């Protein structure tokens, strides 16, 4: 698939045998390759300093079996780039660049696909691949940990959130992405802002909504997961809903709650379960699960109703390859 030809996640899933693989962590993978992301722009810093690295990591995930790759724009905002001294035009260009790099990686992957389906454990199979333009929350822009609390203060209203995100969404939607991945949504008000912006008409492509939880019951702000999902359910342009950046042990219970209030495909891409120290801005070692334990959950998630699976922070192409292998016998291809 190429930009703007995608409309229905259900149709896409028919082409992928009922299940699809989402890529894994980007920022933590950049760091694993040696990138220094100690910056308010976080992974978006690589759009300026090392676009070749972004291309490489996208390609690694495609060769691991990912059917959907997300652009390196989670923490990329016009306001964030302007705070670093970039002009409005340069800031918008960097947003577009995030999607262009992902689409170029998809093209590079297709070029590598020959008659062989694998090589050196690489999955080289021409198949429908979606490019999702990643959009993080207002809290991600603040880079103060509020994306993990959802607490923005009384001064942040629905209209202010819409004004903050509006132009960013327009630029990303016009950059050739197939859909927008609204990720790590921490509260109900921001979900409503995203739904309103999708319905305003300036954003011509659909999106998915993915929330995060720290207790396995509610989203991180304490808002009801079912109320948050209901906002997405009532927005026609939302084509899938689910959970990301949440420990694997919480996923099954959350999915069972989500399934009660949605008819849309359900996606999950948890983190490794490791704890993140927001004050020190680093991951706490030995607090998560390894790939083998992570992938052991996959069957339960599918049985609970999940059809799109991947990974978030601290997951790698190795994780995604293992998920791909788990799906082989479940797919109706």
Swiss-Prot record:
Residues 8-327 form the Hcy-binding domain. It catalyses: S-methyl-L-methionine + L-homocysteine = 2 L-methionine + H(+). Its EC number is 2.1.1.10. It holds the Pfam family S-methyl_trans. Expressed predominantly in roots. Expressed in rosette leaves, cauline leaves and developing seeds. Its cofactor is Zn(2+). It is an enzyme of class 2 (transferase). The keyword Metal-binding applies. GO terms for cellular component: cytosol. InterPro entries: Betaine-hCys_S-MeTrfase_BHMT, HCY_dom, HCY_dom_sf, Hcy_S-methyltransferase. Disulfide bonds: none annotated. GO terms for molecular function: S-adenosylmethionine-homocysteine S-methyltransferase activity; S-methylmethionine-homocysteine S-methyltransferase activity; zinc ion binding. GO terms for biological process: methionine biosynthetic process; methylation; S-methylmethionine cycle. Zn(2+) binds at residues 245, 312-313. Keywords: Amino-acid biosynthesis, Metal-binding, Methionine biosynthesis, Methyltransferase, S-adenosyl-L-methionine, Transferase, Zinc. SUPFAM superfamilies: Homocysteine S-methyltransferase. In contrast to HMT-1, it is not inhibited by methionine. Monomer. Catalyzes methyl transfer from S-methylmethionine (SMM) to adenosyl-L-homocysteine (AdoMet). SMM degradation (by HMT-1, HMT-2 and HMT-3) and biosynthesis (by MMT1) constitute the SMM cycle in plants, which is probably required to achieve short term control of AdoMet level. This is Homocysteine S-methyltransferase 2. The lineage of its organism: Eukaryota, Viridiplantae, Streptophyta, Embryophyta, Tracheophyta.
